[in-house]
Curated annotation (Swiss-Prot):
InterPro entries assigned: EF-Ts_dimer_sf, Transl_elong_EFTs/EF1B, Transl_elong_EFTs/EF1B_dimer, Transl_elong_Ts_CS, UBA-like_sf
Annotated signal peptide: none
Protein name, per record: Elongation factor Ts
Pfam family, one: EF_TS
SUPFAM superfamilies: Elongation factor Ts (EF-Ts), dimerisation domain, UBA-like
Compartments in which it is found: Cytoplasm
The encoding gene: tsf
Segments for region (Involved in Mg(2+) ion dislocation from EF-Tu): 80-83
Amino acid sequence: MIAAADVKALRERTGAGMMDCKKALTEANGDMEKAIEYLRKKGLATAAKRAGKVASEGLVHAYIHGGGRIGVLIEVNCETDFVAKTEDFRDLVHNLAMQVAASRPEYVAREDVPEEVLAKEKEILRAQALNEGKPEKVVEKIIAGRLEKFYQENCLLEQPFIKDMDRTVQDLINEKIAKLGEKIVVRRFVRYEVGEGIVQSEE
C-alpha cells in the first residue's frame, strides 16, 4: 500500500500529477528515488511526443558577475508562456547564465562547433599524439578521446554543472524537462569580460 504522504512528497519533488506519482511509487515498490527516475523518463517521453511543437517562448536573462567585470546574456526557450514564468524555469535560466560566466563555453552544443574549428583541433591533437610517440594505429582513438574532452570544455550542454560536478548541464535541463513537461532549448548566449581582447601596452 502506497502512503498518501509519500505520494504528496513525490509530487512536491517532481511537480508530476497525483495519479502519476501514485503509479510511479507502485512501479518502484515505494522506492522514492526509483519513482523519481520513473517520472523523469515518463516526463521526457511526454515532452518528446510533442517534438513537433516549437519552443518559441522563454526568457532572455542578464547576469553580471565579479562586480561588473563579467556579463552574460542568455536566451532559453520553452513551449509556453506559463512555463516561462515559473520559478523552476527562471531558476534554470539563472543557473545557465552563471555556468556561462564561470566556465566560458564557446558553443551551446557540439553540433554548433564549426567544421573548420573541428578540423584545426583534430590537426593539433594528431600532432600532439604523434609527438608523444604514439603509434599511428592508435592515434585516431586518442584523437576521439581528446575531442570528447574538447566538447566537455567548450560546449555548454556537455560541461559539468558548476553546482554539482557529477551532472552535466544537459542532465540539469533534462530534469527540468521531466518536471515541467515541455521542451527546453538553450538558443544562444554571449559572454563579455572587461579587457577581453585588448592588447596591453608594454609601456
